[in-house]
Amino acid sequence: YEWKKENNVKQPYCFRPTSQPIFALAGLYEHWQDQSGREIDSCTILVGEANQDVAPIHDRMPIILKPEDFDCWLDPQVQKKEQLLPLLKAAPPGEVDHYPVSRAVNSPANDHADLIKNIQAQINSD
């Protein structure tokens, strides 16, 4: 989800690829020890410049990996930037759809399928 301020009201939007029901985001994971010896698992999702579909809502977007790039991205033997950097591109225009959803997405107490329901018709009727 990403939020956009419209008429002094913040509106959340759901984003999803248009061409595939399941997708993967480029991310990094590390297991390490801090100075006290405590073991820590950390992760991050990589973002890049937004494509023209996402730019009206936000200036950045997660890097969506193509299915044919999954093996390369997940292979720990692949460590040369020349092999990995070409995978870190914004999705081409037309490959990401977005629509407004309920503000209920803001609360972790809410966890149900209606959170991803498109509410554009409700907004238009208000």
Regions found by a protein language model. Give the residues of each.
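A structured binding-face within diverse protein domains that lines the active/interaction site
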Residues: 1-126
